[in-house]
Swiss-Prot record:
The gene is hisG. Catalyzes the condensation of ATP and 5-phosphoribose 1-diphosphate to form N'-(5'-phosphoribosyl)-ATP (PR-ATP). Has a crucial role in the pathway because the rate of histidine biosynthesis seems to be controlled primarily by regulation of HisG enzymatic activity. Pfam families: HisG. It comes from Lachnoclostridium phytofermentans (strain ATCC 700394 / DSM 18823 / ISDg). Its EC number is 2.4.2.17. Its main location: cytoplasm. InterPro entries: ATP_PRibTrfase_cat, ATP_PRibTrfase_CS, ATP_PRibTrfase_HisG, ATP_PRibTrfase_HisG_short. GO terms for molecular function: ATP binding; ATP phosphoribosyltransferase activity. GO terms for biological process: L-histidine biosynthetic process. It comes from the Bacteria. It catalyses: 1-(5-phospho-beta-D-ribosyl)-ATP + diphosphate = 5-phospho-alpha-D-ribose 1-diphosphate + ATP. This is ATP phosphoribosyltransferase. Pathway: Amino-acid biosynthesis; L-histidine biosynthesis; L-histidine from 5-phospho-alpha-D-ribose 1-diphosphate: step 1/9.
Length: 215
């Protein structure tokens, strides 16, 4: 039996995903050791391998088959646009992708004038403005705190993840439009789904059962 490799997005998400996996009998004690310098963790009994990766890299590992399964946020899946199957919503890390800005910017979203949009997610922003709103925009890619952009006049609006909206409010900004809901998803490599169909499908069904019971 070959190993099935699971890539987890580093941070809180990996910790929560491992807790759910434990509920279906999938454990990896090696990963719980905070002093470990290992990059790959193994459960020999279940023939499973785990590794932690930067969120944006998880879809790449899965598309190319370096990982059979990945756990990553929907924001990363949309932004990276990789070829893979999205099979399950884990209902973890729920938040929203939104257009935000000062209240005065709301009207700018309803006429055809060119506006500037600052974001960490240029592909999501481009898709939403061009394909859904049919509005021409200039997209400015930033890596730091996006809320700063409209305050200092770099952009009229921003596209960003909103959890509670309190950071926006503190900076005199608000949600102007919601693009889509976000949460952690399970993704599967297309070839792995065929080659290891039985094992992967069982894992997905067991996870689905646990999630249904928790609701």
């Amino acid at each position: 039996m070959k190993y099935i490799t699971i890539a987890l997005a580093k941070g809180r998400l990996a910790k929560k995903a491992l807790e759910i996996l434990e509920q279906i009998g999938i454990t990896c004690d090696e990963m719980k050791d905070p002093t470990s310098r290992k990059l790959i963790f193994t459960n020999e009994e279940l023939k499973l391998r785990f590794f932690l990766a930067k969120a944006n890299d998880v879809p790449t590992y899965v598309e190319y088959g370096a990982a059979d399964i990945g756990v990553v946020g929907k924001d990363t899946i949309l932004e990276e646009g990789r070829k893979m199957y999205e099979v399950l919503d884990l209902n973890l890390g729920k938040c929203r992708m939104c257009i935000a800005g000062p209240a005065s910017a709301k009207e700018l979203l309803h006429h055809g004038e060119l506006i500037r949009v600052a974001t960490k997610y240029p592909n999501i922003a481009k898709d939403y403005f061009y394909n859904k709103k049919h509005q021409t925009v200039e997209i400015i890619k930033l890596n730091g705190s996006i809320e700063l952009a409209p305050i200092v006049g770099l952009s009229e609006v921003i596209v960003d993840i909103v959890e509670t909206g309190s950071t926006l409010k503190e900076n005199g900004l608000e949600v102007l439009e919601e693009i889509c809901p976000l949460s952690a998803r399970v993704v599967v490599n297309q070839v792995s789904m065929k080659m290891e169909h039985e094992r992967i499908t069982k894992m997905i069904n067991d996870l689905r059962e646990v999630l249904t019971e928790a609701q």
